[in-house]
Amino acid sequence: YIVTWGLGHLVTLADPEDYDKKYKEWKLEDLPLQPEPFRLEVIRQTAKQYQAVKAQIHRKDVGEIIIATDAGREGELVARLILKKAGADKPLKRLWISSVTDKAIREGFASLKSGKEYEPLYDAAMCRAEADWLVGINATRALTCKYNAQLSCGRVQTPTLAMIAKREEQIKNFVPKPYYGLRASVKGISFVWQEQKTGNTSSFDKKKMEELQKRLSGHPMQVTAVKRTVKRTPPPLLYDLTELQREASRRFDYSAKETLNIMQRLYENHKVLTYPRTDSRYLSADILPTLTERLRACAVGPYRGLAGRLAKSPLPEKPFFVNEGKVSDHHAII
């Protein structure tokens, strides 16, 4: 095999001025811009790597191309845009794996899929990219020209911003209001009043609660029923990017960007963290046998005792955090 790689996207949709130089100047009368067909351009910052990949694609001793990018929509798009721009016309296979253990890679190569099976995924990715272009380019230019200010608009960005603005407005307009409840402590046991019909344990009606307190004061309490239930609280799921950013914000007051930067260094430079930009909180089954070795690697410094004990414990046969169906492009962060 000859192995080459991208650096994220090497090819993207062309800018408006690449279709016609007049579009370099933003004018309302030019809108909407609707390229047909859309053109592709090589990203300038990574053009050298694109040329390196293109050279491998067109080698005479290469008879087949295997796409081995992330097992997801965006990973498919990364590879397909490179192949389309490079004019690749060789038979296409797909390596579809979400884990990079030796076992997963070997099994993936032993069961390569036809590239045709993933053409609908590529079509979906292109649809998303073109929708982003059409909304982003046209709406951003329209807003900027209309209001003579640099305004940005996006298919995902703008609805998300609207949600934040709506929530901020609710917080600003919130008027605190006192509420009342009843609590009694008898022989070390705490009792909380609960309304029979609604189940509410508090009320905004101060007079109602004061009257209830007067009626109950001085009267003996009678226990009419006792219900005991055993509840099992499952351990938390493993981290994905968002959950780890939340945890770091809560514990250390890190911003989302700070957390991602730290994770990226741990992943790229120190090789002690798996791929950080994942949205999955589960592991694939092939990762399970590697956990003991990973725990031993963590048995240093203050973690020596706990990690060492866990490493000696047998792995569960069907752990809750292993679920092939819920692993997306990448498994959870470990």
Predicted feature residues:
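Intrinsically disordered, low-complexity regulatory segments
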Residues: Y1-A129, W133, P316-K318
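Beta-sheet entry/capping signal
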Residues: I2, G63-I66, P91-R94, E258-R265, ...
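Hydrophobic/aromatic-lined pockets within catalytic cores
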Residues: L83, G87, A110-S114, V135, ...
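Helical mechanochemical/support elements of P-loop NTPase systems and associated helical scaffolds
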Residues: V42-V53, A71-I82, T101-I105, D123-A131, ...
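Extended, highly charged linker/hinge segments and catalytic-adjacent loops that couple domains
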Residues: Y118, Y122-D123, L134-G136, I262, ...
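Short glycine-centered, acidic/aromatic-flanked micro-motifs in structured strand/loop junctions
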Residues: T69, R246-A248, R277
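Long, highly charged, low-complexity internal segments
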Residues: I2-R44, A55, L151-E268, A297-G301, ...
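Short, solvent-exposed helix-loop connector elements
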Residues: L143-Q150
